């Protein structure tokens, strides 16, 4: 017993001496532990640790749309090689020709365009919303902006954000309704005969980006308000295959916006308020990222969407600098694979 007590006493003395030594060293050196910013944590939107080792490139400025910080959205190439995109606050769809001449296509009343998809007959389908009123619609116009048709009326109750055609001419669209704790949006399918709208993946919080795999059997949706990437395996256009849904990725920070697929099935997701595009393989595994110039200093963070030019691997990213003073710009980068053959560029029968 005395031996055990002696050992305990020695242990207590040893601990006391160690504490005194550490205390004396801290007093002498003034070395109180402190967190400090470094190159990886400085700036408004540092790359999350899990994404820092991804293959990374920096896009180049390609076209200055405006010196004003207008929000750009929804780029899509038409059958003539023109780049169409949305001026959200101006409620306009714009056209940029191959020789970089900019002109308006159409102006919308009471709603702002946010997503575009081109039909193989040349018509431009436009997803548009009024965020203040919580309403939205899908309309279509001829290539010159005339002949506007209502495809999905505001009375249907959706807030269409983005859209993509399947090979049959049916239209998937995302519904931007809801908040993170009240998921009222989702992904829907508008049939090729224009008769029915069918829910495919309901109960999402601000469903945003939507894309199809090259074989048309996987539907991808980003959930803006809950930072999720969903994959839906389709048995047919509106039926989910058994064990066919998965959340393949949880994003960090704000916020997954629009996305596009390439011919290899890779996905490109615009990270709104982060000034970058995250790239995933066909299984939803991150494999790369594209950064926009100036993002570490808080510039060009409002990256919303992108388009891959047909028959090339040229990616064009639309963004705004917000209050940073650099206006609204389209950036360019080369990506893993060529553009997916979209419905817009399929041969008409």
Indicate residue ranges for each PLM-predicted region:
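Bacterial N-terminal signal peptides
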Residues: 12-21
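A short helix->beta-strand "capping" segment at the edge of beta-propeller domains
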Residues: 43-69
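A short beta-strand motif characteristic of beta-propeller blades
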Residues: 60-65, 101-107, 147-153, 196-201, ...
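Beta-rich, blade/repeat-based domains predominating
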Residues: 65-80, 109-136, 154-171, 178-179, ...
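Short, solvent-exposed loop/turn segments at conserved positions within beta-propeller repeat blades
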Residues: 88-89, 130-136, 178-185, 224-226, ...
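A short loop-to-beta-strand structural motif that recurs across blades of beta-propeller domains
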Residues: 92-94, 137-139, 186-188, 228-230, ...
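Short loop/turn segments immediately following beta-strands, especially the blade-tip
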Residues: 232-240, 334-340
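Blade-level signature of beta-propeller repeat domains, shared across WD40, Kelch, NHL, RCC1
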Residues: 307-349
């Amino acid at each position: 017993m005395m031996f055990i007590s002696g050992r305990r006493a020695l242990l207590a003395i040893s601990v006391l001496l160690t504490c005194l030594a550490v205390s004396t060293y801290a007093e002498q050196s003034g070395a109180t532990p402190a967190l400090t910013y470094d190159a990886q944590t400085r700036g408004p939107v540092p790359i999350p640790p899990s994404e820092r080792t991804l293959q990374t490139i920096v896009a180049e400025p390609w076209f200055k749309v405006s010196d004003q910080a207008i929000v750009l959205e929804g780029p899509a190439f038409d059958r003539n090689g023109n780049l169409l995109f949305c001026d959200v606050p101006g409620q306009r769809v714009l056209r940029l020709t191959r020789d970089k001449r900019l002109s308006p296509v159409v102006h919308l009343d009471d709603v702002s365009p946010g997503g575009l998809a081109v039909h193989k007959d040349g018509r431009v389908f436009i997803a548009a919303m009024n965020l203040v009123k919580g309403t939205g619609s899908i309309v279509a116009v001829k290539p010159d902006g005339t002949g506007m048709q209502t495809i999905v009326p505001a009375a249907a109750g959706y807030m269409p954000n983005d859209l993509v055609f399947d090979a049959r001419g049916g239209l998937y669209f995302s519904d931007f309704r809801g908040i993170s704790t009240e998921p009222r949006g989702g992904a829907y399918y508008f049939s090729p005969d224009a008769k029915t709208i069918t829910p495919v993946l309901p109960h999402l919080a601000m469903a945003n980006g939507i894309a199809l795999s090259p074989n048309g059997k996987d539907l991808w949706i980003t959930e803006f308000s809950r930072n999720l990437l969903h994959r839906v395996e389709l048995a047919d256009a509106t039926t989910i295959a058994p064990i066919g849904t998965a959340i393949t990725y949880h994003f960090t920070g704000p916020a997954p916006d629009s996305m596009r697929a390439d011919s290899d099935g890779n996905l490109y997701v615009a990270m709104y308020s982060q000034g970058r595009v995250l790239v995933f393989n066909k299984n939803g595994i991150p494999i790369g990222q594209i950064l926009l110039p100036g993002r570490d200093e808080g510039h060009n963070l409002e990256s919303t969407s992108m388009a891959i030019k047909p028959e090339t691997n040229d990616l064009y990213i639309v963004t705004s600098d917000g209050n940073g003073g650099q206006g609204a710009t389209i950036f360019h980068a080369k990506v893993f694979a060529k553009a997916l053959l979209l419905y817009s560029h399929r041969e008409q029968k």
